Amino acid sequence: MNTYKIYLINFDDGFIYVGKTKNTLIHRLKQHKANLISGKSYKLYEHWKSIDIDPSIECLECNLSKKKAIQLEHDYTLAYMFLNQ
């Protein structure tokens, strides 16, 4: 069974990113650089490139099924958007 992780990338300037991956986070970020995909993943990469701030990265949840990871990614994204208003 593939297990997923939910992680939070938090920049000091208020920009946050919540994402899910079944790979390591480093591998996932390399995928972002290799495949400049649209959406919030691309916004993360562009923001990271444009500033000189190293973000804090933390794992919020691990050992999740894909279905649960998708739901939690959505829930955490909404929660952090609400907190940063």
Language model features with spans:
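Structure-specific nucleic-acid interaction/processing domains
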Residues: 1-85
